[in-house]
């Protein structure tokens, strides 16, 4: 009987230690690649579900990345209509304002702050064929003056790399706010 009295407190003590074990919280970038792919899949499903009655401001368009064989999705900002009927060619130089963010909304790079580009913006110039393939294929569809939101899968972005300056998460699905 005496042994049974000691067993109960020992059992309770063991349960307390087991129940106090810390659980690991999910990190901000856990399952990053899979989450990014699910985000693009949701954009693709939204694009596929569109009808002729879908308002122009809500339409999602797509262009095939001829290099990586996946689709780049984009929305046109109707508040920024084209100022010209000209679209850049593969070897053309362009000037853009842009904001690059992860699919979770974290801003990574930008040439403007605030909601819209303004006189304090610092647009950048580059050759269309010298940027990530997602940009290359989307830019060739844009007209001068337009502003689009691009949804770029990781394969058409920086892939498994961390970007030119090493500050990107590998396998990042990217969202760009671009004005040509």
Feature locations, PLM:
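Cross-family detector of peptidyl-prolyl cis-trans isomerase
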Residues: 2-5, 20-180
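Sec-dependent N-terminal signal peptides
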Residues: 6-12
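Extreme N-terminal targeting and regulatory segments of eukaryotic proteins
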Residues: 12-13, 24
């Amino acid at each position: 009987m005496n042994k049974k009295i000691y067993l109960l407190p020992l059992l309770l003590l063991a349960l307390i230690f087991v129940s106090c074990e810390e659980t690991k919280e999910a990190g901000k970038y856990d399952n990053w690649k899979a989450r990014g792919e699910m985000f693009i899949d949701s954009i693709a499903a939204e694009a596929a579900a569109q009808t002729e009655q879908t308002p122009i401001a809500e339409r999602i368009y797509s262009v095939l990345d001829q290099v990586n064989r996946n689709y780049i999705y984009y929305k046109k900002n109707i508040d920024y209509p084209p100022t010209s009927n000209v679209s850049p060619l593969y070897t053309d130089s362009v000037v853009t304002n842009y904001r690059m963010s992860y699919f979770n909304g974290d801003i990574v790079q930008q040439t403007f702050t605030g909601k819209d580009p303004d006189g304090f913006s610092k647009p950048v110039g580059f050759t269309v064929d010298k940027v990530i393939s997602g940009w290359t294929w989307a830019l060739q569809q844009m007209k001068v003056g337009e502003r689009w939101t691009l949804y770029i899968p990781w394969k058409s972005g920086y892939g498994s790399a961390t970007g030119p300056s090493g500050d990107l998460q590998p396998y990042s699905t990217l969202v760009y706010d671009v004005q040509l």
